[in-house]
């Protein structure tokens, strides 16, 4: 089956920050970028041809679970992306990045159309993110990312999202998981009520 070619000039990828050894001038030029390219079934050169930016321009160090992230800088740089980029589709890599664009409490793989653009909230590609430990999550992420980058919409009946929590979070925060489901169902209702 012939698949639509990925038009790199219409795509933007936004990450958190460069890795400890990463070059701040080359967003997603390391292992995380290679993982995204592999999942998207695009060459690394095609990935580099897309618009790319880190919301924090320098590695900020470590915290308990993953890297530190400066939300104030992230918010400013997210606003710059919205004002400066002329792309149709933007992949937001991780929950911190999604929050800087104003998307809170949405699951991974949620697609949002707003500001005349489409956004995909994609799991952070690093190995620290346990979401990637389940094969079905990776399979679903790969399928959705490929469709999104080609400009296709998710067909009806295709699961749009899965669990965004790790096992330890799920067992310790049952109430939070229920709130997430409520957010998703409210969002679906509002789409259908618009007509």
Identify the residue ranges that each predicted region occupies.
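A polyanion-binding, active-site-adjacent surface
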Residues: 1-110, 114-131, 135-155
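Charged phosphate-binding loop/patch that engages nucleotide di/tri-phosphates or the phosphate backbone
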Residues: 130-175, 181-195
């Amino acid at each position: 089956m012939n698949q639509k070619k990925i038009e790199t000039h219409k795509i933007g990828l936004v990450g958190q920050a460069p890795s400890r050894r990463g070059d701040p001038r080359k967003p997603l030029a390391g292992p995380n970028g290679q993982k995204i390219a592999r999942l998207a079934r695009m060459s690394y050169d095609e990935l580099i041809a897309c618009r790319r930016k880190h919301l924090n321009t320098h590695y900020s160090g470590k915290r308990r679970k993953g890297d530190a992230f400066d939300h104030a800088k992230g918010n400013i740089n997210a606003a710059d992306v919205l004002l400066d980029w002329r792309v149709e589709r933007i992949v937001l890599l991780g929950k911190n990045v999604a929050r800087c664009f104003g998307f809170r409490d949405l699951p991974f793989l949620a697609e949002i159309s707003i500001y005349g653009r489409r956004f995909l909230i994609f799991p952070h590609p690093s190995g620290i993110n346990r979401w990637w430990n389940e094969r079905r999550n990776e399979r679903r992420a790969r399928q959705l990312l490929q469709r999104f980058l080609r400009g296709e919409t998710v067909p009806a009946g295709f699961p749009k999202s899965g669990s965004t929590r790790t096992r330890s979070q799920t067992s310790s925060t049952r109430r939070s998981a229920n709130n997430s489901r409520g957010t998703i169902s409210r969002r679906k209702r509002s789409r259908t009520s618009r007509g």
